[in-house]
C-alpha cells in the first residue's frame, strides 16, 4: 500500500511489524498508520490484561454453578468496551499528531497504546474501590 501525497514509502500495516517494532528507525507519517499502530498496541495489551483477569475469574469461580458463564460474559463485555474506547482514543491521538504536523516513532505508538490500557485499569480500579 502506498503512502498518500507523492511519498513512495511503504505504510507499515503488518501486525508482525507492529508487535516486533520491526520498523526500527522509521517514522509513522500517515493518520492511518499512526492510528493502526497505537490501536494494535492497545488491543493486544488489553487482550493480555483481560485474558489474565478471565483466567483468574475462571479459576476462582470454578465451583460456582454459573461461575464459568459469568466469567466469560464479564470478560467479553469488558474487552469489547475497552477496545471500542481504544479505537476512538487512538484515532484522536493520531489526529492530533497529524494536525500538529508531527511524525510518530514506533516506540511512541507503543507508549500511547499501552498507556491507554494502563489508564483504563487505573480508572476501573478507582471506580470499584469507590463503591466498596
Swiss-Prot record:
Keywords from the named record: Cell membrane, Glycoprotein, Membrane, Transmembrane, Transmembrane helix, Wnt signaling pathway
Membrane topology: Multi-pass membrane protein
Residues bearing glycans: 12
Chain segments annotated as transmembrane: 38-58, 69-89, 105-125
Pfam families linked: Tmemb_170
Tissues with expression: Expressed in normal breast tissues. Down-regulated in breast cancer cells (at protein level).
GO cellular component terms given for this protein: plasma membrane
Name of the protein: Transmembrane protein 170B
Organism: Homo sapiens (Human)
Amino acid at each position: 500500500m502506498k503512502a498518500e501525497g507523492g511519498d513512495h514509502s511503504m505504510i507499515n500495516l503488518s501486525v508482525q511489524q507492529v508487535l516486533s517494532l520491526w520498523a526500527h528507525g522509521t517514522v509513522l507519517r500517515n493518520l492511518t498508520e499512526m492510528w493502526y499502530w497505537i490501536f494494535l498496541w492497545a488491543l493486544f495489551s488489553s487482550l493480555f490484561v483481560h485474558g489474565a483477569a478471565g483466567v483468574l475469574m475462571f479459576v476462582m469461580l470454578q465451583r460456582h454453578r454459573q461461575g464459568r458463564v459469568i466469567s466469560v460474559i464479564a470478560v467479553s463485555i469488558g474487552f469489547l468496551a475497552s477496545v471500542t474506547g481504544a479505537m476512538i482514543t487512538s484515532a484522536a491521538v493520531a489526529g492530533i499528531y497529524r494536525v500538529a504536523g508531527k511524525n510518530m516513532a514506533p516506540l511512541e505508538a507503543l507508549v500511547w497504546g499501552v498507556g491507554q490500557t494502563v489508564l483504563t485499569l487505573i480508572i476501573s480500579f478507582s471506580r470499584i474501590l469507590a463503591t466498596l
